[in-house]
Regions:
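Alpha/beta-hydrolase fold catalytic core
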Residues: 1-47, 69-72, 109-110, 145, ...
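Flexible "cap/lid" loop of the alpha/beta hydrolase fold
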Residues: 129, 136-181
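Conserved loop-alpha-helix segment in the C-terminal half of the alpha/beta-hydrolase fold
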Residues: 246-288
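Alpha/beta-hydrolase
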Residues: 179-263
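Hydrolases whose catalytic domains are alpha/beta-hydrolase-1, hotdog thioesterase
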Residues: 123-127
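Catalytic histidine-centered segment of alpha/beta-hydrolase-like enzymes
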Residues: 285-297, 301
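Active-site loop/oxyanion-hole signature of alpha/beta-hydrolase fold enzymes
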Residues: 27, 32, 69, 79-115, ...
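Conserved HGGG/HGGXW glycine-rich cap/lid loop of the alpha/beta-hydrolase fold
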Residues: 37-86
Length: 309
């Protein structure tokens, strides 16, 4: 595991309120190098942030400093195949959970608060349920699913459904094994990302390109492994998280978007309520899309800090 201060990059694009992490280091997770980024005082109480699919830790460059200013050592990591972490031969939900545990183990041996957005929210919900001795409180930012479970079917039919998922997933991995992401200018990459994040400003998306893409000889490319695809968490369905919610053993604060977006989950309080633990606190933010912490960083940070106090 190595650690260093983050050096200034002459090609970084400025954005109001954004601060690059103060430190970066790497954690070994089963032989894979996982990049870990930190904001705030190293001696402050730690909390863990998990990003969503197709994102990276630097998407918290506005939100994380607000939590650090509230007195926390804020730690996030680039999930395998994302950002500055190494690409892997295969990607599975279980591998992501193991990576999260390895990062958490490098931060604290005691229970700490965890915050996740989208896929990261479901990931940390899973972790909090499985390892409540490691998690003191959970904040889930639009990572709570409400899609209906598969109806009860015969076991041989259930196995057939899973077999097709696995075959499709492995076929995709074979086809893209030697693929490379399409290059472009910074502005082109920002516009492409904007098609998936239509509510985020072009200025913010340019900032993300500078933080999360690499400049090759033929142009800029996102660092994301080209084999990744939506829903590419391996044989896992988001709605399985619903089964864990009623007995969640740690306090939970949840945020939901009110505007549908391509990368969003379209979960509503009404559909979620039957599955929530009794003391869960849920807020639906009006006129807000999937990237709640980017659209409303100050409001979300204030609510989170009150919840953690």
């Amino acid at each position: 595991m190595s650690e260093s201060a983050v050096a200034a990059d002459p090609e970084v694009v400025a954005f109001p309120g954004a601060q690059a992490p103060a430190r970066r280091r790497f954690v070994d997770s089963g032989g894979l190098r996982i990049a870990v980024h930190e904001w705030g005082d190293e001696q402050a109480p730690p909390l863990l942030l998990a990003h969503g699919g197709f994102d990276f830790a630097r998407t918290y460059d506005v939100f994380a400093p607000l939590l650090a200013a509230g007195g926390y050592r804020v730690v996030s990591w680039d999930q395998r195949g994302h950002g500055d972490s190494e690409h892997a031969a295969l990607y599975t939900w279980d591998a992501d959970v193991r990576d999260a545990l390895n990062v958490l183990d490098s931060v604290s041996s005691e229970a700490i608060p965890v915050i996740g957005h989208s896929k990261g929210g479901s990931l940390l919900t899973h972790l909090a349920d499985a390892c409540p001795h490691l998690v003191s409180k959970l904040v889930n930012i639009d990572g709570l699913p409400s899609r209906a479970r598969h109806p009860d079917v015969a076991e041989h039919e259930r196995s057939r459904l899973l077999a097709k998922e696995l075959a499709d997933w492995l076929d995709h991995r074979r086809v893209v094994a030697s693929a490379a992401r399409k290059p472009g200018t910074m502005a082109e990459l920002a516009r492409r990302r904007g098609r998936m994040n239509p509510r985020l400003s072009h200025e913010w998306l340019l900032y993300l390109v500078a933080a999360g893409a690499q400049h090759d000889a033929d142009g800029w490319r996102w660092k994301l492994d080209p084999s990744m695809r939506f829903g590419g968490f391996g044989p896992w369905r988001p709605e399985w998280t619903l089964l864990r919610l009623p007995g969640l053993p740690v306090p939970m604060l949840g945020f939901l978007a009110s505007i549908s977006e391509p990368m969003g989950w379209d979960t509503t309080e009404e559909s979620l309520r039957p599955h929530l633990p009794p003391d869960a606190e849920i807020h639906t933010l009006p006129e807000t899309g999937h990237f709640i912490h980017i659209e409303r960083p100050h409001e979300v940070a204030e609510r989170v800090l009150r919840f953690l106090a």
